[in-house]
From Swiss-Prot:
Its EC number is 6.1.1.19. PROSITE patterns: AA_TRNA_LIGASE_I. GO terms for biological process: arginyl-tRNA aminoacylation; post-embryonic development; reproductive structure development. The lineage of its organism: Eukaryota, Viridiplantae, Streptophyta, Embryophyta, Tracheophyta. The keyword Nuclease does not apply. It comes from Arabidopsis thaliana (Mouse-ear cress). This is Arginine--tRNA ligase, cytoplasmic. Its main location: cytoplasm.
């Protein structure tokens, strides 16, 4: 059998490289079953295992096969496996599992190559080229609150992971900047500030209060309500005075959002509901021409199989709604932005809405019938942020928690903990401030991202700022400690990278090396499943593997110092890339 040299296509991705080897083996072992995909998983009794034997046996046992059972199929897979520098040995376990042990020399060489060529050479390659991630999406004239936290940071992490995996990502902020509520806001603005051109953020003050006061007047004052309804008509009709007032409210709101995004290091391009207005009528017309739109109780609707209530696309008063805007946005993203994968990050409560409008899009022929081919749509639903009482997280006054206040408190608590440890005497005020911010915001993000997004989680500053266990604080400490070990060696790590060699002779060295090499497949899994907690789990276990390595293997002053310093550096690099993908700023000293 010819030797297959490790493929550069999947550098630093043993799982993918093994899949290529076993793909050859499968085609040689069972040439009559050409569509069988290699099933490669991390192994219980080896580094990896191939799980095809049992499935293959069930396919071929009635077809006059030479094999006598799954173990014989597994043995044949081993015999047909091309020789490769990455594989040390293979063996059969149980009912035909093929256990694979990687070559320690190959593992060491792969890590050395990453240290020279950079962590980006380990980035997975996905089959999709361009994706839209629709996330955050607050409503104009309302402040961002704790409910926006999850969409904002989950969406940002998904975008970062896809970008790292060589996907062009269009980060979209689908803000609520249109609708009947603007009539009441504009009319209230006119009453308070007859000269709207001179209105500033300072003059309006707290937008949340402004919104509440206008809503109260709308509910209690019939004359004001009528004016507000007329204002909506004028705004939608393009009246320049009303358009200007609307633009002013949007601008003030946008500036408030920008402050939060800057603090969280979130990049977004706004394409709000109003952006799609010019396209809605044509999209509804296209859906009507395909026979999808029907009249029902004065409204125009699409009936969706499996749902009792239809999807309303034109209200009985002739106005448009969320469904009309969302369908139009999807049409635009597919036809104008040429996106192959459109990902919506919202709470799980909106699941039915997405199910219905995705089915409507399939009915229209915009999307394929299955979820495996492109273009594809995905709803990334997430659970609630809960308080100690297991109910929706609120302030003591039963108010929604403002996101800006939450960020302030995270930073303040982080700073207080650092001062308690005397860091204000060691560091400059600027350093203290920067590190407090990195730790505080990092703790907030990680506590959210480490939870499977589908479930809710209980918000607790005490828990998330704990320096022990699965927290950002613990992980940032671990990274800072690795940096300290390298600094204390007195060696130029960049020079060592060029000439030094890694040996994975000790069991703890090898375990750490294997975990480092599982980084690319972890990012790929987190991207394809749209689950950031997969990456968080990897990062936490990486810090645990490093702790075991450091407890068992002396680094500085040992005979293996160069190799072990390079392992420290590789761990720090992978940790930093994980932090980057999670939107967390690493710290180099704590």
């Amino acid at each position: 059998m010819a030797t297959i040299v490790a493929s550069k296509e999947f550098t630093g991705n043993p799982r993918r490289q093994l899949a290529k080897l076993f793909d050859v083996s499968l085609k040689l072992t069972v040439p009559d079953e050409p569509n069988v995909e290699p099933l490669i998983e991390p192994g219980k009794f080896g580094d990896y295992q191939c799980n095809n034997a049992m499935g293959l046996w069930s396919l071929i046992k009635g077809k006059g096969t030479q094999f006598r059972g799954p173990p014989a199929v597994g043995q044949a897979l081993i015999q047909s496996l091309p020789t490769s520098e990455m594989v040390e040995s293979c063996s059969i376990a149980g009912p035909g599992f093929v256990n694979v042990v990687l070559s320690s020399k190959w593992m060491a060489k792969s890590i050395e190559n990453m240290l020279v060529d950079g962590i980006d050479t380990w980035a997975p390659t996905l089959s999709v080229k361009r994706a839209v991630v629709d996330f955050s999406s607050p409503n104009i004239a309302k402040e961002m609150h704790v409910g926006h936290l999850r969409s904002t940071i989950i969406g940002d992490t998904l975008a970062r992971m896809l970008e790292y995996s060589k996907v062009e990502v269009l980060r979209r902020n689908h803000v609520g900047d249109w609708g009947t509520q603007f009539g009441m806001l504009i009319e209230f603005l006119f009453e308070k500030f007859p000269d709207t051109e001179s209105v500033t953020e300072t003059a309006i003050g707290d937008l949340q209060v402004f919104y509440r006061e206008s809503k109260l007047k709308f509910d209690l004052n019939p004359e004001f309500k009528e004016k507000a309804q007329q204002a909506v008509v004028r705004l939608q009709g393009g009246d320049p005075v009303y358009r200007q007032a609307w633009a002013k409210i949007c601008e003030i709101s946008r500036n408030e959002f920008a402050k939060v995004y800057k603090r969280l290091r979130i990049e977004l391009e706004e394409k709000g509901e109003s952006f799609y207005n010019p396209y809605i009528a044509n999209v509804i017309e296209e859906l009507s021409s395909k026979g999808l739109v029907e009249e029902s109780k004065g409204a125009r609707v699409i009936f969706i199989e499996g749902f009792k209530i239809p999807l309303i696309v034109v209200k009985s008063d002739g106005g448009f709604n969320y469904a009309s805007t969302d369908l139009t946005a999807l049409w635009y993203r597919l036809n104008e932005e040429k996106a192959e994968w459109i990902i919506y990050v919202t709470d799980v409560g909106q699941q039915q809405h997405f199910d219905m409008f995705f089915k409507a899009a399939r009915k229209a022929g915009w999307l394929p019938d299955d979820d495996k081919t492109y273009p594809r749509v995905s709803h990334v639903g997430f659970g609630l942020v809960l308080g100690d009482d297991n109910k929706r997280f609120r302030t003591r006054a039963a108010e929604v928690v403002r996101l800006a206040d939450l960020l302030d408190e995270a930073k303040d608590r982080s700073k207080a903990a650092l001062i308690e440890r005397g860091k204000d005497k060691e560091w400059s005020p600027e350093e203290l401030d920067q590190i407090a911010e990195a730790v505080g915001y990092g703790a907030l993000k990680y506590a959210d991202l480490k939870t499977n997004r589908i479930t809710g989680y209980t918000f607790s500053f005490d828990q998330m700022l704990n320096d022990k266990g699965d927290t950002a604080v613990y992980l940032l400490y671990a990274h800072a400690r690795i940096c300290s070990i390298i600094r204390k060696s007195g060696k130029d790590i960049d020079e060592l990278k060029k000439t030094g060699k890694i040996a994975l002779d000790h069991a703890a060295e090898r375990a750490l090396g294997l975990h480092l090499l599982q980084f690319a497949e972890t990012v790929e899994e987190a991207c394809t499943t749209l689950l950031p907690n997969v990456l968080c789990k990897y990062l936490y276990y990486l810090s645990e593997e490093f702790t075991k390595f450091y407890s068992n293997c002396q680094v500085n002053g040992s005979a293996e110092e160069t190799s072990r310093l390079l392992l420290c550096e590789a761990t720090a690099i992978v940790m930093r890339k994980c932090f980057h993908l999670l939107g967390i700023t690493p710290v180099y000293k704590l």
